[in-house]
């Protein structure tokens, strides 16, 4: 059976997840955000940035609540970073 890839939804200092749209640029923004935080990969899932292999030291949620504050990813690069 396929092993679950560990990951989570990163949150800012107010414990807000990062909102995103299901556009290519936002998938890239989420990936760049995740890599900046020490994760290996990231994408937009249910309008929320999700990171794979996010270090335990990074504040994160394991699931999305129905009512949640959303942090913006405006300012995160939307092009592939080296």
Swiss-Prot record:
Disulphide linkage map: 16-69, 20-44, 30-49, 34-51
Highest taxon above the source species: Eukaryota
Localization per record: Secreted
Molecular function GO terms recorded: sodium channel inhibitor activity; toxin activity
Family: Belongs to the long (4 C-C) scorpion toxin superfamily. Sodium channel inhibitor family.
Tissue expression summary: Expressed by the venom gland.
Gene Ontology biological process: defense response
Name of the protein in question: Toxin NaTx-13
Domain notes: Has the structural arrangement of an alpha-helix connected to antiparallel beta-sheets by disulfide bonds (CS-alpha/beta).
SUPFAM superfamilies: Scorpion toxin-like (SSF57095)
Function: Probable sodium channel inhibitor.
Keywords associated with the record: Disulfide bond, Ion channel impairing toxin, Neurotoxin, Secreted, Toxin, Voltage-gated sodium channel impairing toxin
GO CC, any one term: extracellular region
Pfam families, per database record: Toxin_3
Record keyword Metal-binding present: no
